[in-house]
Design a protein with these regions (language model features):
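Structural core segment of the AMP-binding/adenylate-forming
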Residues: 162-222
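A short N-terminal helical cap/helix-turn-helix that marks the beginning
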Residues: 36-60, 79-104
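Glycine-rich phosphate/diphosphate-binding loops that line cofactor/substrate pockets in enzymes
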Residues: 94-96, 132-137, 181-189
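Conserved AMP-binding/adenylate-forming core of the ANL superfamily
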Residues: 86, 103-158, 175-180
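Short, charged, surface-exposed hinge/linker loops at domain edges
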Residues: 12, 18-20, 50-81
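Adenylate-forming
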Residues: 37, 90-94, 121, 125, ...
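Acyl-group handling in specialized metabolite and lipid biosynthesis
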Residues: 23-25, 30-33, 72-82, 106-116
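Short, contiguous pre-domain boundary segments
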Residues: 6-32
Length: 222
């Protein structure tokens, strides 16, 4: 067997402590859950929904039609329910786990990474959300995020969700014209970007590309 083939078959066994904290302890346990989700989807997803905080509980779990012979394809989830996904992701963890790490970020270059606790992340998300509101972004508006893989990316995503805005993460390798087209098609209300980033050893002028995209939008009457 070649070294490449050996590498493909190399397994990394987690520690017992790490494995015991897993939500699923075995493949058979996963298969059992999967079968339950297929057999009775509403019951399964109702149990999942009960693990979330709801300001108002949903009236139904799901309503859908995937048969075009019976009408237009449609899917609705948790009709009548009201919650905020960032409350579930951040706020409800602050009291007991605020000092725990929410995520680690490892940079492209060989410099120190960053670890943000739930408390730190919550503060930054609220700041970003309020900044968007100050700019006039409101519930239902589309916000494009044209950024490299930096900590501010998930912060921007969560900030949009916190105020009910729809975020669209745009691939950082797109041209200014492609970015412009997507902004126009989605009737984008705001664009969040960064000064630049590394791609390998090359510096990519993200902000310059974003500025060109905005100029293109304006030239097209958007």
């Amino acid at each position: 067997m070649s070294s490449l083939e050996q590498e493909k078959h190399h397994l990394f066994k987690p520690s017992a402590d790490f494995a015991n904290k897993s939500h699923l302890k075995s493949l058979s346990e996963y298969q059992t859950l999967y079968n339950e989700s297929i057999k009775d989807p509403d019951k399964f997803w109702s149990q999942i929904a009960n693990t979330f905080y709801w300001q108002k509980k949903p009236n139904t779990i799901s309503q859908y039609n995937l048969d075009i012979q019976k009408g237009p394809v449609s899917i609705k989830w948790f009709e009548g329910g009201k919650t905020n996904i960032t409350y579930n992701a951040l706020d409800r963890h602050l009291e007991k786990s605020g000092s725990k790490v929410a995520f680690h970020w490892e940079p492209n270059a060989s410099v120190a990474g960053i670890s943000l606790t739930y408390k730190e992340l919550h503060k930054k998300v609220c700041q970003a959300a309020n900044a968007l509101k100050t700019l006039g972004v409101k519930k239902g508006d589309c916000v494009h995020i044209y950024m490299p893989m930096i900590p501010e990316l998930p912060i921007a995503v969560l900030a949009c969700a916190r105020i009910g805005a729809v975020h669209s993460v745009v691939f950082g390798g797109l041209s200014a014209e492609s970015l412009s087209d997507r902004m126009i098609d989605s009737k984008c209300k705001a664009l969040i970007t960064a000064d630049g980033c590394y791609r390998g050893n090359k510096i990519i002028p993200i902000k310059e590309i974003a500025d060109q995209a905005l100029a293109s939008c304006e030239a097209k009457g958007f």
